[in-house]
């Protein structure tokens, strides 16, 4: 339990220190820290439409649409604890605005459990624990499938292209391997930091994964199923402590976030950190976090591990089945950062060997490029976008 104790100690240190140094309300938040994705679009020259998409199992997800003029539809899928907002936070430099300016028909999806996915036809996320009984498996098998089908019906297109970051890539690989008919509906998939095999994850995330079973028991004993939801008190406190003055940038970002995602202090400046905190974290389920811990600890890209007895009941096997990546026959482009401790070059090399069609592969040139630089770096237009557009052209 040493890792848990250390985490609690760090959080208490942040709370006490920030309370001493920070006076709430002194720092006026950046405008972009408070804008909705619709307001972002208007500010940067594009209209944004909102749609409700209902999954097969009753979850209601918000799908944002930035209409394009000349090119095909692209669906963007965010990472864990994130939302569709992530792709527009950089304004004119963001992926959404960049694609829209190029004429693409842009769709930004959300998964169950984040701030745009806390609705269900029958379940109440505040009172029904069943609402939170999901991991990234369901985000791929149900959520992504529903979003893709909605876009195809809405546009009368035969297929779309997808771009995923982190968990957004996991969802794509789950869908394409579990429901192979979607390989015809997704004709090209760009995977930014593809999170599948996580055998070589580095500390501190690897240390947390070792404590995964203990963390899981601890959370379940407290009845905690939703983690870091947008409206939860813990998230509100975190956003308050980490959005005030430049002091919080050094304490919350440089000292706490960067060790997890990769030390690269030059691509996220203090002013933009304030924008990030205004929109993140956005919530997920306990089970989603634990499923990733299982990938790290068990060193397999596999279904959720419920334990031998429940596994046998669900899967007819004592261990959860691996996802059959040989079923992924669509065109795939893999992007990996040399300084990403979560999705490492070694693990992406394993993924490359598992795919039946040789994927396009791009190792990011800056040596310090990390896990979150794919969505928030201040030089994405130089080091990332040219290769994204090259992949999209190959998908035509």
Predicted regions, residues:
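Short, surface-exposed "cap/lid" segments of acyl-processing enzymes
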Residues: 55, 66-121
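Short beta-strand/loop motif that positions the catalytic acidic residue
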Residues: 328, 334-336, 340
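Cleavable N-terminal signal peptides of Sec/SRP-targeted secreted and luminal proteins
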Residues: 3-27
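Alpha/beta-hydrolase-fold enzymes
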Residues: 153-158, 169-313
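Alpha/beta-hydrolase active-site loop
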Residues: 130-152
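Catalytic active-site module of serine/aspartate enzymes centered on a nucleophile-bearing elbow/loop
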Residues: 362-396
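Conserved alpha/beta-hydrolase "acid-adjacent" motif
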Residues: 341-347
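N-terminal cap/lid segment of alpha/beta-hydrolase-fold proteins
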Residues: 37-67
